[in-house]
Regions:
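Hydrophobic beta-strand segments of well-ordered beta-sheets in folded domains
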Residues: 2-6, 23-28, 42-45, 73, ...
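Short, well-formed alpha-helical segments that are part of the catalytic scaffolds
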Residues: 4-25, 32-38
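Residues that line or immediately flank small-molecule/substrate-binding pockets and catalytic motifs
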Residues: 9, 77, 122
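A generic secondary-structure signal
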Residues: 19-20, 61-65, 105-109
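Conserved catalytic core of nucleotide-sugar-dependent glycosyltransferases
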Residues: 83-138
């Protein structure tokens, strides 16, 4: 399953660090800011300035314009220092290839269960996780 991961960003190229840790992520920025992000070393996808306004508008632009490029489209924050999971009370951080594999297998599982979208817990606190009951269908 082909997975594409995008991180919308706005007026903060220096804080857009997700690509440092996960080069597979494409940062989505508006035309007027693209040069700043490119100078910062980001690999960008440029959207029109008219798509910008708030995070919901840019996420909708990503869904409307970039979804056909892959089987699974993920949208994450532009300032992630790591993405990981817990197993046996220990935290593990994904490497780039592991993140792609995890997203691909998660998307495949959801598809097989008849679901079309899913999300991950974004809280770093171990107490917020139920590692032995990893799925919720609410």
């Amino acid at each position: 399953m082909k997975v594409s991961i995008y991180a919308p960003s706005y007026k903060r190229p220096e804080k857009s660090i997700t690509q440092i840790h996960y080069p597979c992520v494409k940062v989505v920025v508006c035309e007027s800011q693209a040069d700043e992000y490119i100078k910062n070393g980001n690999d960008v996808v440029v959207c029109p300035d008219s798509a910008q306004g708030n995070i919901s508008r840019i996420r909708n632009w990503i869904l409307d314009n970039l979804y056909n490029d892959s089987d699974c489209l993920m949208i994450i924050d532009d300032d992630c220092s790591y993405i990981g999971y817990y197993n046996n009370q220990k935290q593990y951080k994904f490497e780039n290839d592991q993140l792609l594999e995890f997203c691909s297998s998660s998307a495949l599982l959801c598809d097989e269960l008849g679901y079309k979208h899913f999300g991950f817990n974004c809280v770093a606190d171990k107490g917020a996780y139920r590692e032995y009951t990893p799925f919720g269908f609410t």
